Amino acid sequence: MTQSQTVTVDQQEILNRANEVEAPMADPPTDVPITPCELTAAKNAAQQLVLSADNMREYLAAGAKERQRLATSLRNAAKAYGEVDEEAATALDNDGEGTVQAESAGAVGGDSSAELTDTPRVATAGEPNFMDLKEAARKLETGDQGASLAHFADGWNTFNLTLQGDVKRFRGFDNWEGDAATACEASLDQQRQWILHMAKLSAAMAKQAQYVAQLHVWARREHPTYEDIVGLERLYAENPSARDQILPVYAEYQQRSEKVLTEYNNKAALEPVNPPKPPPAIKIDPPPPPQEQGLIPGFLMPPSDGSGVTPGTGMPAAPMVPPTGSPGGGLPADTAAQLTSAGREAAALSGDVAVKAASLGGGGGGGVPSAPLGSAIGGAESVRPAGAGDIAGLGQGRAGGGAALGGGGMGMPMGAAHQGQGGAKSKGSQQEDEALYTEDRAWTEAVIGNRRRQDSKESK
């Protein structure tokens, strides 16, 4: 059983925070980096950045869904506290009876990251260590020379700073305390930590792009240019006498080219950026809808034809007080009080046929009619359960008969005449004398009144 606790709640603060948490954050960059040159290592590096950026965007989208779930939980908590306020008001209206429970948080919600996977790794194979000198220079000089990589890096660096500046929404609450508040604040802090980590990964990916761009600049500076190589070859062809001096220069170019290509192949191999899955948001379900109340005890169940009359008898469902009374002038002046008392005691009547009407009326004397003390309401034809009002009415009918009998024995309950004459009871009439229903539920006392327990046994 949940233990009651004192909580501090500002419902509007929770609702405002839900709107804050759910508000869209900055969109990640969508720039696609292109290779700075035609070297295989450069192409692989650019492709790795594309895959990492795509996965970052997918993880960020999953994080947005979790923030929406968190906002929904906050709204559900605020709504629940609103209903708790109503329950508290009801409890106060009920003379302070009843308790109000603090809203508690449930388990985590659904997993929006179920489809997320690690970032694929691109193959790191590059050009062979030996490549034609002029072909290597041509490939190195073809492309945007790292311009798109620099733009890509700038975009993700800016995004990193934007994310870091947008975590205030995950702060704690000023006017909400309790178990649910603690759980929600923990979930908010998890989201904050995850956003900060995604910001760091954004900066790391930007550094990778910057590094490849700088690596390419270094390679261009260290590698012989295509123009230099073509000029050297032309000089070699046109000046046979200078070939002995030209060959060592060409060999040096080749050596420099191989060194640059080796460095490019090794250093351009990037690690994939693998973001963590967003933490699942805390789940607080909406308050259940109010339960529909059944028949209120004391209200009669109307017949199916809507007439308010018991089928087959033409009589109202509640037995009527007999119009005849004692020779002294009918019912006493305090009839209403006696009927109310009788209604309370009627609920305690046993099904024992030995109960006499005098036990209700309080007076002795007079013959007890052999017929049942209830009204003729159709007998076995009535198949519906008796409501509390029926029971109270039954008590009223018996009270009237008892009062008349106590005064002089002249009164007779309605319906008694048609049951037959004589002092002997048949087996069937004895069964009809048995109580059809005994009300013994404490929660109906507000309708039929308080009574002493086990009155039926004491009155025998």
From Swiss-Prot:
Keywords in alphabetical order: Acetylation, Secreted, Virulence
- Gene Ontology biological process terms from the UniProt entry: biological process involved in interaction with host; protein secretion by the type VII secretion system; symbiont-mediated suppression of host autophagy
Q: Name one GO cellular component term.
A: extracellular region
Provide the disulphide bond pattern.
Answer: none
The keyword Secreted appears for this protein: yes
Family note: Belongs to the EspB family.
Which miscellaneous remark does the UniProt record hold?
A: BTP15, an inhibitor of ESX-1 secretion, decreases secretion of this protein without being bacteriocidal. BTP15 inhibits autophosphorylation of MprB with subsequent up-regulation of espA and decreased secretion of EspB and EsxA.
**Annotated domain remarks:** The N-terminal region contains a fused PE/PPE homology domain. The C-terminal region is disordered.
Q: What is this protein called?
A: ESX-1 secretion-associated protein EspB
